[in-house]
Amino acid sequence: MNRKPGLHPRNRHHSRYDFDALTESCPALGAFVRPSPAGEPTIDFADPQAVKTLNQALLAHFYGVREWDIPDGFLCPPVPGRADYIHHLADLLAEGNGGALPAQASVLDIGVGANCIYPLIGQHEYGWRFTGTDTSDEAIRSASAIIDANPGLNRAIRLRRQKSPGAIFNGIIHKNESYDATLCNPPFHDSADAAEAGNARKRRNLGLAADSGLNFGGQQQELWCEGGEVGFITQMIAESKLFARQVLWFTTLVSKGDNLPLLYRALEQAGAVKVVKKEMAQGQKQSRFIAWSFLDTAQRERWAQNRLR
């Protein structure tokens, strides 16, 4: 088996896509499969409908999600990379749980999106319970439709709309709630122009015309915010301090490694007791997430004994 370099050992996507098996799970994919120049089956990754149908097939084949769709223009996430975040998060929780992967974790997904991808993967792989949040009504409606269309998911995944676009945890984490972890794929760009420039680069890399549609889509709240990635995560760090005793691990993806020093400084100023960086890779693409806790070692161990075992 040709393993994709860098993926987590438990990631289900190490080998090349088996298009025969995927098409059996999702017959609609067959219309998009074509031979590559080397004669291997593939799809046109510049075709948004082909990419979306591939995701439908991957979710059906590997994660038991029989009904999945997103509205046009919303982010269509690469499933292997999203799964990696979940698996590395499981390892982080296991480190404080005697090495045992937790089956009882409760996770808060900031920016669940129309695709609901992290809850779908995390619930299937580990049986975790999720609360997904988003500022977009349309994203919440789409995620809710996915949950309702797949039996059993409504017992494991609940959704909350963030009614204050400038807030992250405020208004979402209730007074008597606790979460074992939060996760987030934050907006990367700091303006609409920067987001469009990024999409233009993506189109050039795919050999697309300048006026062609986006490959993976993305709404404003998914792609950019004032202050960009650093601004968003810095606010997240500041708000996390308000919920220091209600969350074991706060985590977020960090797309740009150069942003880490600023974020570490913000974490120090916020009084984070423990900060961890988890490196991830998918082929040539490098990524990472940072995690922080306001609980000391003894408090984290007690938390795990009470909630994760």
Swiss-Prot record:
Top-rank lineage group of the source organism: Bacteria
GO cellular component terms, semicolon-separated: cytoplasm
Enzyme class: transferase
Main location: cytoplasm
Family according to the record: Belongs to the methyltransferase superfamily. METTL16/RlmF family.
Molecular function GO labels: 23S rRNA (adenine(1618)-N(6))-methyltransferase activity
Name this protein carries in UniProt: Ribosomal RNA large subunit methyltransferase F
Keyword flag Ion transport: no
